[in-house]
Amino acid sequence: MKVVSLLPSATELAGELGIGDWLCAISHECDTPETVLHQPRATGSIIPSGLTQREINDKVAQAVREGQSLYTVDGELINEIRPDLILTQGLCDVCAVTEATIEASLRGVSCSLPRETTIVSFNGESLNGIRDDFFLLANAVGLVDHAEQVWGRRRAQWAQVAGRKTSKRVLLLEWVDPPYSPGHWVPEQIEAAGLVSAYGAPGDHSRPLSMDDIERSRPDAIGIICCGFGLDANVQFGQSLADRLTAEIGFHGEIAAFDANRCFSRPTFAVIDGAEVLQKTFVEGHEVDGMSRFIQR
């Protein structure tokens, strides 16, 4: 079976299911598993590299206002591959290519994509939703029994993480300029780690926050998980935000940065790993190599 993934989380779920070698093309943002990174990239972004967070936010807001997709699809490449299955998402126009974009790009009058090509759209907003997406993929490729085994191991891992409880209030920020609250599965991760979500409940959508909002949420600690960025970049974002937090609201609590791509941003079973990292960082009080780092102030 020939599979094209236009979504980093779909590529990760394919790897978790053991079908990474079925992938014939991946998205421009896919960075794991390493065994698929040689595949051609079937998507691109209209957002140029090198922009500040504020500039990225403004570009995204403008595109959303104008009804413009943030992503491009290489229809010529996909038509050449003639895939049996295309993996995408319907959760967030900002995060990745949506099914509507694919339909517009690949199902046009001059398009040669076979009618038999199946488009599977993932929409998980919680751990249970991510599980459902995983089984949606497993059903599409006929590997449900294997998926049951994988999910059993991951479910046990989640249960082990979720066994501890503290009263420590943590605010995770999915963006810092402007600050954005945690959404979808992230508050669920906070609670599973044994912490209290200072702002945002499981299933909530991320929203912009003022410094007054942050102060009113009374966090004991703040985590920087800017969507789409790794640890080093989030350390830089955290260092710049720390000065503002001190100057504007007198916050002197812990601030830690995380590898958002590997722990929080993508709806995959990596969110379970992310809950573990969160627990080790803010409950046990130590950094996780390559995953979390405290901001020195």
Cite the ranges covered by each PLM segment.
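N-terminal ligand-binding lobe of clamshell/alpha-beta domains
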Residues: M1-R297
